[in-house]
Amino acid sequence: MNEERKCPITGATHKPSAEKGRSNHDWWPNQLNLKILHQHSALSNPMDKDFNYAEEFKKLDLAAIKQDLYALMTDSQEWWPADYGHYGPLFIRMAWHSAGTYRTSDGRGGAGTGSQRFAPLNSWPDNANLDKARRLLWPIKQKYGRQISWADLMILTGNCALESMGLKTFGFAGGREDIWEPEEDIYWGTEGEWLADKRYSGERELEKPLAAVQMGLIYVNPEGPNGKPDPLAAAKDIRETFARMAMNDEETVALIAGGHTFGKTHGAGDASQVGPEPEAAGIEEQGLGWKNQYGTGKGKDTITSGLEVIWTTTPTKWSNNFFWNLFGYEWELTKSPAGAYQWTPKYGVGANTVPDAHDPSKRHAPAMMTTDLALRFDPDYEKIARRYYENPDQFADAFARAWFKLTHRDMGPRSRYRGAEVPVEELIWQDTIPALDHELIGADEIAALKATILASELSIAQLISTAWASAATFRNSDKRGGANGARLRLAPQKDWEVNQPDELQKVLQVLETIQTEFNASRNDGKKVSLADLIVLGGCAAIEAAAEKAGYKVTVPFTPGRMDATQEETDAHSFAVLEPVADGFRNYLKAKYSFSVEEMLIDKAQLLTLTAPEMTVLIGGMRVLNTNAGHTTHGVFTKRPETLSNDFFVNLLDMGTVWKATSEASDIFEGRNRSTGELQWTATRVDLVFGSNSQLRALVEVYGCKDSQEKFLNDFIAAWNKVMNLDRFDLSGL
């Protein structure tokens, strides 16, 4: 064998990637994936430990970078010439596609992390040639360095593109911090090939949490469902996918029409002329993809979507000409040079009315995509589109607001917004929380309130369950939910099944009475919000439960939360935060295609928990008797409401043998191996901590005789983390 082919370390022969050794996942594809709990660690982040992006962004000269971006718009480069001499339309598409992956169901996707730089997004078919847009931006990113993230730069560039073409934008907020590795937690679908659509079932029911019709698309197929040019069918897909990213019909029409006011699509030749996407391209391409062998491979010969559409007479100027053309012509089905379905005016009308992108001597007829015509032929969309057509100022305002929502929806509350262009107007989708309006309670008041709470009729389990219900709605994906605002007492959260509404109401009444009496007794301006009191009640209960175990502990508590009102709460928007499963409370609303173990990991990831943090919280919550519905599944202790390590000790006990008691193998009995006596019952969430080898290793740490104190410390630390996940006023971002 040629010695040069052997690895200098192991002596093993190098093999093509397809022949490399099999991974654990290859051998056991159903193995629980805990890796998503350990993403984006300091090990992959090149920034210094004390790097604070919010502080760096404050140093950014926003006016200066915007001037540089305006100049870039018309600085056409030979290696990737600008259509119409203006990169604005390309940059709008880049920003749109950065933000447009967001979906409301789990809050994942969106522009908040700069993930368009990494797989799979950097290689999605719908993102073809956006690699060039980011390369065009590199000199500006290089100039301003760490003062602006790629995530912020892509959105700011989209704003500058719009402004440079005549639109007054609604505003811009910075504060998006970059990630440094691909996001592995996002479920994009099961399809194994681009543009497949196995995500549908029944009468075209789109699988949740997905918000795109095909693998590798941002929203919909512009040619129509599965490439069938049916505008009405396309309208159904549009309405479903845009709704799943929090857009109503008015916002949807504004975004489509506004976005298609600019630029063109690219389908100069057959797609077979285009090379592989960035992640599959050769090393010499240096991260670029879609190398085009047709003609010059750029400019007039560009191939991206395969469609060759110019919508308006002024592709680099804001106008309502999109509507003028949409309603001004009758349309017939044609095909692009690449063979994609599109529409042109009947009878040759409209010829020579729109400019060529690269040859000033040439003119063309306008064209539309099937999804564009949906705005004319769907009755509800058509009414809105005509209103915008007849009221250009209303259209401009609607687009500016919808664009701001599109590009900022996943940033969370306004307290995370940074920069001089943050809009003054508060919008209900921002989950507004009132500004602090009172003096904060201090150590003496905190101690007195704890004593009052513990002296009330409320149990340890009730107090801890209520605090968890309030805080654990948080999703790090879009920074929504959490204890701040006390929205637990408002619709829809107060009525969620997992929160046991009747019991919750009793708990809240007791806490509200304590709050009212305390605030009325003060003449020094100090008050306590219900949001703070809910969390404080949980902290006090944990201290009491630890004392029952023989340990005196102090659970950290930082006041400063405020109470939102029902008027500040969009019940429909908050409905997506309802847990369909919460393994920490042993709750499952219904049967789902995902296992409850997978749903636990998903919940933990949204709460930013590591595997050890998840493990210690599960063990603590079980012995504290906080299961939804007061079930005893997983309560492996003879002394409930005592914060002990009993869950771990008893789970590891070889004297217990487990057997499924339900047909679905989701409920189990644990019996004494010798006598057969029933000892415990459990769910899959409970038993996975003994079954999964990695989780069992963690359980063993907490199941040792010398681990009680470590268990308490780790549980309190993880609890405090969850209680403060939405305290951006404390964390800076």
From Swiss-Prot:
Keywords: Heme, Hydrogen peroxide, Iron, Metal-binding, Oxidoreductase, Peroxidase. Formation of the three residue Trp-Tyr-Met cross-link is important for the catalase, but not the peroxidase activity of the enzyme. Binds 1 heme b (iron(II)-protoporphyrin IX) group per dimer. The record marks 93 as: Transition state stabilizer. There is a cross-link at residues 219-245 (Tryptophyl-tyrosyl-methioninium (Tyr-Met) (with W-96)). One of its GO terms (cellular component) is cytosol. Residues 16-25 have a biased composition (Basic and acidic residues). Its cofactor is heme b. Heme b binds at residue 260. The active site is at 97 (proton acceptor). Coiled coil: none annotated. One of its GO terms (biological process) is cellular response to hydrogen peroxide. One of its GO terms (molecular function) is catalase activity. Its EC number is 1.11.1.21. It catalyses: H2O2 + AH2 = A + 2 H2O; 2 H2O2 = O2 + 2 H2O. It is an enzyme of class 1 (oxidoreductase). There is a cross-link at residues 96-219 (Tryptophyl-tyrosyl-methioninium (Trp-Tyr) (with M-245)). Residues 1-25 are annotated as: Disordered. Bifunctional enzyme with both catalase and broad-spectrum peroxidase activity. NCBIfam families: cat_per_HPI, PRK15061.1. Belongs to the peroxidase family. Peroxidase/catalase subfamily. Homodimer or homotetramer. This is Catalase-peroxidase. It comes from Chlorobium chlorochromatii (strain CaD3). The lineage of its organism: Bacteria, Pseudomonadati, Chlorobiota, Chlorobiia, Chlorobiales.
